[in-house]
Structure formats: C-alpha cells, structure tokens
C-alpha cells in the first residue's frame, strides 16, 4: 500500500508501476524501475471521468480485451463477470455519459478486472463509491488476490479499510520513501468518532418543498422531497451511486433549477439571486475541485491579504505560488474548501468533500465544518464517507436508489440495420454526381427522388425537420445571394448598383438551392442514425482503416461528452464564485479558456488510461462487435447511384447539363 500526504508522489509512482509514463514530456526519470512478468497490468485512476473510453458500458469493459487480443468468444463472459463483481447491473448498451461518478469508477474497476492482470494498481479506487460499492469492491479485490495470486498496489488515505489485505505499507513524502512501520497506527484503528452535536438555532436557513430535481432540466430524478436545514446544522445527503446527491446539492445551492417544487434560502429563491449575492451567502465545492479556480496562483485565489493565514490553516503554505491546476487532487480539494468556507456565508454545500484528502486535510475539514456549524452556518454535504458523517454528528438524509432502467429505446428505422459505410456511399455518390453540373433539371430531379425516399429514410428519425434546418437555411441564403449578385442573363427584373436580378440569376439561384437540398438532405437524414461506435467498427473491419487511429478518434469523440459535463460544472462555479454577473462575452471567454485547459488535462489522463488497458500494444485488435456488410446493404449504394444517374441523365437528355469544370 502507498500512503502519504497529498502531493507526495503516490499517483506518479502508481503510473510508473503501470508503465504508462514513458514519454520525455512526462517528466525526468532517475534510477531504474523493474516490474517482473509480462502479464497485463491493471490501473484504475483517481478521477472516474478521466478513464471512461467508450460510449457504452459493455464496449468500455471490452476495450482492454480487444487491445489484448482476447478472442471475441471469451469477451462476453469476462465482461459480465467483471461488471457483476463490482455490482454494476446495467444494460449492455447503457450510455456511459449517463453514469454517475461512482458508477463510472465501478466501470473503470471492471475494465481493469476483465483483463485479468497480474499486477493491479488502484489509485484511490473507492473514494467515489457508496458504502455498498466499497464493500463489494473490497470483497472482489480480496478474492482476486487470494484466488488468482495477483499483486496488488493500492493508493489510499484510508488505510484501515485495506488492513486485512495489504502486507506492506510504503509512506511517501515529497517524492521519497520515508521509514514507516509495516502496520502503522492508522491500519489498526480508525479515529474514534466523537458524535459531536452542534447547537442548532431555531431559524431555518434552507428549505425544500415538494422538490423535484433534474440534471438536464427535462427528466425527473427520483420522487418529490421535502427538506429543512436550520442554522448550525450539518446535513449529509446519502444514498447509492446515481441516486441524485450531486443534483440535489447543486439545486439547493441555487445552481440548478428545480423541475418542480421550490427551494427557499433565507426566505428567498436562491435561483433568483444574482451571482454576487449568491456567492456572499453560499459556499460551494464541486466533486471535481479543479472547477473552483479562476486565478493563476493559490495566493491569488485566497486573496493576497489573507493568503498566508488561510494557507497555514489548510496546509497550503508551501504551494502558495503554484498554479491551482498543477496541484494534486487532495491539494486542490483543500484549496476549494478554503475558498468555500470563508467569512460571510450562511450555507456551505459540499460534494464529496473528503475525497482525496490525506489525514491532515481530513482533520482540518472536520474542524472547519464543526466551527462553521458553531458559528451558525448551515452545512449540506453529499458524501459516501460514513466516518465523516459520524465525526461531524451530521443528520442524514438518505436518497433512495433511482432505477437505472434500460438504455433509451428509440423507434426502429431501416437505417439502423444498414452498415455505416453503405449509408456513406448512398449519400456520397449522388453528391459527387450533382457536383459535376449546376442546372435546374438535375437538381429538380434529385430533390424529387430524395423527397420520394424521405418517408423511408426519415422513419424513426426524431425531429428530422429540425435536423434539416441548417440545410434549408444554407439553401435559402445561397439562393438569395446568387439571385441578387449572380451572373445576369435574359430579362432584367431589377437593377440597383451591384444588385442585379435577372432571369438567369433567378434560374441559377433556384438550381443552387435545389442542389444544396439534394446533397444535404440525404447526408443529414442518413447520418442522423449512424452510431459512432458502429461507424468506427465498419472503418476498421470493412474499410481496413488503421485500428489505433480509428479507436483513438472514437475515444476523442467520447471526450466531448466529458468536456460538455465540465462546461456545465464550470458554469455552476462561475455563478457560485460570484463571477456570473459579468458580460456574456467575458463569461464565455472565461469558461472556454478554462475548459480548453481542462480538456488538455483530460486528454492526457485519458491517454494514460487507454495505455494502461493495452491500447497501442499491438498493431491489430480483436473486436467485441462484428461489423457486417450483408448483400442488402448494396441496395443503399444502388439507390444513391440511381439518384445520381437519373438526375444527371435527365439534364443530359434535356440539354440542360452545365458542367462545373470545363
């Protein structure tokens, strides 16, 4: 077991052991590190979002198996077993973007277990899990170590939970191993709970009446609930992963709008507060603390006049001049807690505040929250940490589990059965044909043929009219531009300066508009149902595109989902830190720049997670999903070719063919 204070180098050593820090850009390496054995190594990182590679649950677990050349016939049993071992009972095609942080962490652990590693490296693997999840993972890891004889290296600040499993404890400090006993005190006994109760006051600070919460503003999460928090009271939101603790916490903080019911903070709706007014009464720490920072140094974040004093109380003195995003996870959380628990707040809302904290940071957290309660602040924290709840004497509000359900069912369409490459050909062939000429006949025939096929193509495509809007707008604007400024011929209808509307310009405008519709409509409708994963499978298996290039691109697309989530949380914190009243341009620029920086960090972590699951180890891969190109798919290509041939043929037969080139 690796332990030590935040920033001591535990995660770096874990990555080195996993063999994923080889590039010169990763840092300077001195000495030698030898890992015996050629079997796969499993690595689970701290942040769940940084290691979800694929868009669907089973595909994500299969990722490492494909890279390791595991036969497809063996994958299903491995995937099912690994997911069962971590208690993640979801549909095979359940979108990974809809998982909570704890569910993502279970998925990452399942991905590592499925590879049957000889060396399993876990970097704070259970910090985001609910108690049932922690117990299930601990039992699974214990069984694997016992039955399979794998070597386990675990990084955790809570050594007690691993006391029955680890044989040796290594303590790091400032990147060096320091002498420590084989069984330090924290392995044998947890800090005694003090059950300290706070002198609550009568006044109600926060209340929720018939509150219905929603993350996306459209789908209700759980049942309506009622809640009241008084001054000086600490309330812990509990419940399993995915129960809605984060959503409820951010709704209570005035950062998310309720779907129903009402939230009242000091007699007012917190959602109606200005950003500055809200920041003066509410302090917020998100689950990922990096979203809390807006300045280039810890000193500037804390305020230069009070930085030394606050940094000393939170153990941040040695890093005052460091950039907040360069800190370790535990250091970032301590800084975020320091920022949220300043003077003036009446309510603190904390999402997993003890996650990634070392023993010193945890002790400071407990002291600070107790002091805040004694001063009359209301404290709401979403947490899985039983010991923290016990030490704080918090009142628990337990959210029931929310049924995961099945993956969203959408109406079936003929497009769902088509190979993506066939659909690509069906859209590309008529487009190439129409690009060879610009005339009214070919464009008109093509639009008529496409229109006749819309009932077949658009069946099962939701909101296809909305999807077509960009094409229609492009068509309309192009037609107007050419009608006013195109080459004039024939009868002149209107002339004013550079504007000339003639018979020829109107004919050309109509032909251009119809051609844009004829080219754009099939592409939009055909690709509206193409799944990115199926398209990647078709490219690698049917088109023989480079495997690693295709999969890397697919992982990059999934990163957009993570970045979209980052943008949402960042916007919460812009409001929570009192910066949401600025002009739209300044807010957008601020959020965009930070998201860009976070995206770079995310991509680095994602690349590390992919490498840990054998990505790039072999030139070829096996495939969990088989991409087929049955005979019926040639009908799509034939249909596209027919549209192109009939359109151009009609123009030639009528003498209207107007070659674009030559």
Predicted regions and their residues:
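Conserved ABC transporter NBD signature motif
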Residues: 26-39, 261-269, 278
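Conserved ABC ATPase "signature" region
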Residues: 74-91, 307-319, 338
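Helix-to-loop junction immediately C-terminal to a conserved catalytic motif
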Residues: 18, 253
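The feature captures the beta-strand-to-loop junction immediately N-terminal to the Walker
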Residues: 3-5, 238-240
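Conserved ABC ATPase signature
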Residues: 95-99, 103, 323-327, 331
């Amino acid at each position: 077991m690796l332990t030590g204070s935040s920033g001591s180098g535990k995660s770096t050593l874990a990555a080195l052991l996993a063999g994923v820090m080889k590039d010169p850009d990763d840092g300077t390496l001195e000495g030698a590190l030898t890992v015996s054995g050629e079997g796969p190594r499993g690595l689970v990182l701290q942040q769940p979002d940084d290691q979800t590679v694929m868009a669907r649950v089973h595909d994500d677990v299969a990722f490492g198996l494909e890279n390791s050349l595991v036969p497809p016939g063996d994958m299903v049993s491995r995937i099912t077993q690994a997911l069962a071992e971590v208690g993640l009972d979801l549909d095979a095609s359940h979108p990974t973007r809809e998982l909570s942080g704890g569910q993502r962490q279970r998925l990452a652990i399942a991905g590592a277990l499925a590879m049957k590693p000889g060396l399993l490296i876990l970097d704070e693997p259970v910090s985001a899990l609910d108690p049932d999840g922690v117990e299930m993972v601990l039992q699974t890891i214990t069984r694997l170590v016992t039955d399979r004889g794998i070597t386990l290296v675990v990084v955790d600040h809570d050594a007690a939970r691993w006391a029955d499993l680890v044989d040796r404890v290594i303590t790091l400090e400032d990147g060096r191993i320091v002498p420590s006993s084989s069984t330090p005190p924290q392995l044998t006994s947890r800090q005694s709970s003090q059950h300290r109760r706070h002198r609550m006051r009568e006044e109600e600070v926060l209340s929720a009446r018939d509150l219905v919460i929603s993350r996306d503003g459209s789908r209700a999460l759980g049942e309506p609930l009622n809640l009241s928090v008084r001054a000086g009271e600490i309330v812990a939101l509990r419940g399993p992963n995915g129960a809605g603790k984060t959503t409820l916490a951010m709704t209570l903080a005035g950062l998310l709008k309720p779907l129903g019911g009402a939230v009242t903070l000091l007699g007012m709706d917190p959602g109606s507060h200005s950003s500055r007014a809200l920041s003066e009464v509410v302090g917020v720490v998100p689950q990922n603390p990096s979203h809390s920072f807006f300045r280039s140094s810890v000193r500037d974040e804390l305020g230069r006049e009070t930085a030394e004093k606050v940094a000393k109380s939170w153990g941040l003195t040695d890093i005052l001049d460091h950039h907040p995003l360069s800190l370790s996870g535990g250091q970032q959380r301590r800084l975020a807690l320091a920022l949220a628990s300043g003077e003036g707040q009446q309510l603190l809302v904390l999402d997993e505040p003890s996650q990634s904290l070392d023993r010193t940071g945890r002790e400071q957290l407990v002291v600070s929250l107790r002091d805040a309660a004694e001063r009359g602040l209301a404290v709401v924290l979403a947490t899985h940490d039983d010991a923290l709840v016990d030490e704080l004497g918090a009142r628990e509000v337990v959210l029931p589990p929310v049924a995961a359900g099945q993956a969203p069912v959408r109406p079936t369409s003929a497009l769902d059965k088509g190979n993506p490459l066939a659909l690509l050909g069906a859209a590309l062939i008529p487009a190439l044909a129409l690009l060879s000429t610009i005339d009214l006949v070919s464009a008109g025939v093509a639009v008529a043929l496409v229109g006749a096929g819309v009932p077949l193509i658009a069946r099962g495509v939701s909101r296809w009219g909305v999807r077509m809007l960009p094409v229609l707008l492009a068509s309309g604007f192009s037609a107007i531009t050419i009608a006013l400024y195109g080459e004039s011929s024939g009868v002149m209808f209107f002339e004013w300066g550079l504007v000339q509307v003639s018979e020829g310009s109107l004919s050309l405008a109509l032909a251009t508009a119809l051609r844009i519709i004829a080219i754009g409509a099939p592409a939009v409708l055909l690709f509206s149902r193409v799944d990115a994963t199926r398209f990647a499978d078709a490219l690698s298996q049917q088109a023989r595109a480079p495997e690693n290039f295709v999969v890397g691109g697919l992982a990059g697309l999934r990163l957009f989902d993570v970045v979209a989530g980052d943008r949402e949380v960042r916007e919460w914190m812009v409001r929570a830190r009192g910066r949401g009243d600025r002009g739209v341009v300044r807010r957008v620029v601020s959020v965009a720049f930070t998201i860009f920086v976070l995206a770079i960090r995310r991509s680095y972590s994602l690349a590390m997670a992919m490498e840990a699951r054998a990505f790039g180890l072999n030139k070829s891969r096996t495939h969990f999903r088989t991409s087929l190109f049955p005979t019926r798919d040639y009908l799509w290509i034939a249909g596209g070719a027919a549209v192109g041939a009939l359109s151009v043929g009609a123009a030639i037969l009528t003498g209207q063919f107007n070659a674009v080139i030559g």
